[in-house]
Amino acid sequence: VFQVFDKGTAYWTAEGGTHFVSGEIFKAYGQAGYERGSLGYPISDEYSTDSGRIQEFQGGVITSSTSGTYTLRYGTGIANAFREIGGVKVVGLPRTSETHSGKGVYQVFDNGTAYWTPQGGTHFVRAGIFNAYGSKGYERGFLGFPVSDEYSAGSGRAQEFEGGVIAWSAGAGTYVLRYGTGIANAYRDLGGARFLGVATTAETPSGKGVFQVFDKGTAYWSATSGSHFVRGEIFA
């Protein structure tokens, strides 16, 4: 049931109890069809976050901040990823609506950006990895869209993209490995960050080739012999 008041509307269900919806969130709720729309009934009161306000519904959330009012409907890729990663407590509130870019879409949040494609699903890119991603042109650059979430690897963190890998560690910083180059291809073929850890140096010229150090080995490349990793007791 619902009851309308001067400054909001109260909704009640046996499962969710009673919650008021008001202000900008109520306007967005109305645009979504109120309780008969995809959002269903409210299941929380409106509450504050570091950057704005949010209210949870059976089918999604509505957020309101100085960046605007946005609706995230569960059942869509970005909204589902937002919920699964920890919601507003982890990535904050949306700063933009979903924006089409090439074969996918993205949406900017306070603490990261979510990317979605039909092939790769939805993945958030955040913090140091996001900064490196931006320096290479984001999804329109050679890296393309993310194809994994960020994950722990060796001494740091890594995230995979269509065109390469970005690896980060507190001690060594952030490095981008671009597929199509000798060392990056060998790194991928051997199992990538999950097997060799993250890069701890950039590619370094040496004689007629280059080398790059990783947590669990060093890759060497030359035009005549290609790329090879040296690891373990053989490296020692």
Tell where the protein language model's regions lie, with residue ranges.
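Extended, compositionally biased repeat/scaffold regions that form elongated interaction surfaces
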Residues: 1-236
